[in-house]
Every structure is written in structure tokens, then in C-alpha cells.
Amino acid sequence: MAIRTFKCADTEAVFQLRRVARFANIERPALRKLKQLDLARSIEDLRAPPANRLEQLMGDRAGQWSLRVSDQFRICFRWTGSDAEEVEIVDYH
């Protein structure tokens, strides 16, 4: 029921309310999504709102899920039991 680990130090910094230059344009929506991820008790909790566009990933990211932050950025993570692990904000394109 919480974010257990971060895969990216910059993502953890955003979650801890620190400024990260490369995420300056998406700071607010990224923080909102990270907070939602931290509060989720099940993966199903992340299906709302629909704008999250929760997706189970395939290929080289098999086993991961993603939440849409913007057209360009996603929050990718692994879901284990009731926790998110290896959380990172990635430039998806």
C-alpha cells in the first residue's frame, strides 16, 4: 500500500517535493500520480481516473505497469502484492 522502492533518484526527488530540472514541465502532474500510486491498495485503484491510462507493459518492460503523466512521460513500476516497486518517470518516446 505504498511505494517501496524507486528505480530513479530523480523520481524519488519529485516524490519528496524537491525540484528536478528535467521534470520541471511535468512536476505537478507527476507528483499527483506518484501520490496516487503511493496510496493505492490494489492495482485496480489506479484505473480511476481514466486519464491515468493504466497499462500492463510488454516486451522489454514485461512485468511492469505504467501510468500516463503526459504525452511524453509515463510512471513505470512493478506491482507486488499491495506495493509499487522500482518506480521511475520515463520519457516513453
Q: What positions do the PLM features span?
A:
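A short, surface-exposed loop/turn module that caps and links secondary-structure elements
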Residues: 41-65
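Conserved phosphate-interacting/catalytic interface
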Residues: 37
